[in-house]
């Protein structure tokens, strides 16, 4: 383990505290709710869902936060403006910690930022995300909102290298004429969470993992990713699981995906990650112990270099 020479930013936001030197603060964990084909969703366009089941999932993640000391985020996904607004209104009623405003639709993200501002809970919200594809209209909308935290994606489709990821943050790289950090600052973002943009295995997954070190070493900013997507996009694993099912080993086929899915978060944590978007919130009881264990090993090692873990660190809670 190691310490960065660069002073490391610590983000304190909506009750969560993360960032800093490896071993200082536990990794923050973000579980996604209302994702595509989530069984609790009854109408994905209108945002109709089983409220009792949704609250139970959010409460279970909060319980895991209390047990391990790892801060929890709720990543709220909605495919339409109506759905995302309905979802975040509900989440703000049952959860007072950080929540991500997430959608594949820019219009939906804009509507969510506006609603959070209007309803007075923008101080809980993390925009997902500021990236090279963001339109001027969306950035202007974000600027006019009260949202002050955002995922900032360091991905340049023209240059997926580690240098390319740093360049897109600093000067826009080969795709934009403005760096993503400057764009975030212009949009009123005070709390940038750098996402190293993990791509599939064989197409730059390793570059993204290495970029986590580079971002912290060069910029001192909190980093993380949705690295759990790597196993989902792994063709070999898909075929391997198919073979297991054909052999009648359905449970092993499920288990091997879970092992790789949760294990991916350990990779990000070990490579100086400050937060992970671990996937379905349903997996909180799997993700939190795995990442907490990793945090404990990192913190115990980092003590020899003078890094003192905070009181609520898993190393102080789970031994």
Swiss-Prot record:
The UniProt entry's GO biological process terms, in alphabetical order, are: methanogenesis, from carbon dioxide; methylation; one-carbon metabolic process
Q: In which pathway does it act?
A: One-carbon metabolism; methanogenesis from CO(2); methyl-coenzyme M from 5,10-methylene-5,6,7,8-tetrahydromethanopterin: step 2/2
Supply one GO molecular-function term. tetrahydromethanopterin S-methyltransferase activity
EC annotation from Swiss-Prot or TrEMBL: 7.2.1.4
Q: Which reaction does it catalyse?
A: 5-methyl-5,6,7,8-tetrahydromethanopterin + coenzyme M + 2 Na(+)(in) = 5,6,7,8-tetrahydromethanopterin + methyl-coenzyme M + 2 Na(+)(out)
Superkingdom of source? Archaea
Q: Which InterPro entries match?
A: Dihydropteroate_synth-like_sf, MeTrfase_MtrH/MtxH, MtrH
Protein keywords: Methanogenesis, Methyltransferase, One-carbon metabolism, Transferase, Translocase
Q: What class of enzyme is it?
A: translocase
Write one Pfam family the protein is assigned to. Answer: MtrH
Function field: Part of a complex that catalyzes the formation of methyl-coenzyme M and tetrahydromethanopterin from coenzyme M and methyl-tetrahydromethanopterin. This is an energy-conserving, sodium-ion translocating step. MtrH catalyzes the transfer of the methyl group from methyl-tetrahydromethanopterin to the corrinoid prosthetic group of MtrA.
How is the subunit organization of this protein annotated in UniProt? The complex is composed of 8 subunits; MtrA, MtrB, MtrC, MtrD, MtrE, MtrF, MtrG and MtrH.
Q: What's this protein's family per the entry?
A: Belongs to the MtrH family.
The protein's name: Tetrahydromethanopterin S-methyltransferase subunit H
Organism, as annotated:
Methanococcus maripaludis (strain DSM 14266 / JCM 13030 / NBRC 101832 / S2 / LL)
Provide the organism lineage as a comma list.
Archaea, Methanobacteriati, Methanobacteriota, Methanomada group, Methanococci
